[in-house]
Swiss-Prot record:
UniProt-listed Enzyme Commission number(s): 2.1.2.9
Reactions that this protein is recorded to catalyse: L-methionyl-tRNA(fMet) + (6R)-10-formyltetrahydrofolate = N-formyl-L-methionyl-tRNA(fMet) + (6S)-5,6,7,8-tetrahydrofolate + H(+)
The name this protein goes by in its record: Methionyl-tRNA formyltransferase
Superkingdom assignment: Bacteria
Similarity comment text for this entry: Belongs to the Fmt family.
Native source species: Rhodococcus opacus (strain B4)
Keywords attached to this entry: Protein biosynthesis, Transferase
GO molecular function: methionyl-tRNA formyltransferase activity
Coiled-coil residues: none
Entry's Gene Ontology cellular component terms: cytosol
Pfam families: Formyl_trans_C (PF02911), Formyl_trans_N (PF00551)
């Protein structure tokens, strides 16, 4: 099939790589978000999908808005049979959805209808789910509401960060997406409507939402930290210092919520149940470092609390 692929960040790369290698499909163009300015040097940076397409000589479309007449005209001229989508980063209007002959197939990193929305992997870890997966579904106007072609499942490990889990789902989801496109071409696959039960929503994780609440149980704090790692990153304030917090480990020691203990065994902070031991921290504007080294160097007042 003639394929136009839409995607932007690194988790979309395995899917595009598989489709480029596929002997059955021809990726004639990709759609990705416009180049961004990033870093201290304020350099213009191509999205991972745009960079991959460039390396293979594939046409790259970067509309500011998918309603632009020039974009609509070019997409129509490309005459795609199908358009797979993986984390593109913008909603597509109906006039765009209507262009491919077989529609758009979205790869979403949850077992729909669970965790519809922008941050399904983060939500699944934060909620303490044992299992998640990826769903390939036909894109429609609603938010992740279209009928599902197929799914793959993935167990959530006790130490998984969002980055760990998303990496595995990106790989297994890529294989699913290729299989679904093969089935669509063969006329051998049918999309099944999502059930009305089991719907949940995963809003985008803001920096404020990533702040650690020390009045919650240790297990919840641990899941929260892992769910927002690597980005936007869990954080807290201690005195007048804002710290990004890396992995934490629940312990058997008891401290009051936010209470701090610095001993040979580690840098501990209390929760509503047991204390957790901090592994790595990153003071704002500085490099990541061992949490115990930071705490010893900070010479914390006995009354200071994590907020």
């Amino acid at each position: 099939m003639r394929i136009v692929f839409a995607g932007t960040p690194e988790p979309a790369v395995p899917s595009l790589e598989r489709l480029i290698r596929s002997p059955r499909h021809d990726v004639v163009a990709v759609i990705t978000r416009p180049d961004a300015v990033a870093g201290r040097g304020r350099k213009v940076v191509r999205s991972p999908i745009g960079a991959l397409a460039d390396s293979h000589g594939i046409e790259v479309l970067t509309p500011e808005r998918p309603t632009e007449p020039e974009f609509l005209a070019r997409l129509t001229d490309l005459a795609p049979d199908c358009a797979p989508v993986v984390a593109y980063g913008a909603l597509l209007p109906q006039k765009v959805l209507d262009i491919p002959a077989h529609g758009w197939v979205n790869l979403h990193f949850s077992l729909l209808p669970a965790w519809r929305g922008a941050a399904p992997v983060q939500a699944a870890i934060g909620a303490g789910d044992d299992m998640t997966g990826a769903s390939a579904f036909r894109l429609e106007a609603g938010m992740d509401t279209g009928p599902v072609y197929g799914v793959v499942t993935e167990r959530i490990r006790d130490t998984d960060t969002a980055g760990d889990l998303l990496g595995r789902l990106a790989d297994s989801g890529a294989a699913l997406l290729e299989s679904v496109l093969d089935g669509i071409e063969d006329g051998a696959i049918t999309a099944v409507p999502q059930p009305a039960e089991g719907v949940s929503h995963a809003a985008k994780v803001t920096v404020e939402a990533a702040r650690i609440r020390w009045d919650r149980p240790a297990a919840v704090v641990d899941r929260h930290v892992r769910s927002v790692t690597p980005g936007p990153g869990a954080w807290t304030t201690i005195g007048d210092v804002r710290l990004k917090v890396g992995p934490v480990t629940p312990t058997d020691e008891r401290l009051e919520p936010g209470e701090i203990s610095v001993t040979k065994s580690g840098f501990l902070i209390g929760t509503s149940t047991a204390a957790v031991r901090l592994d790595r921290v990153q003071p704002q504007g500085k490099k990541q470092m061992a949490a115990l080294d930071w705490a010893r160097g900070a010479r914390l007042d006995a009354e200071v609390r994590a907020q």
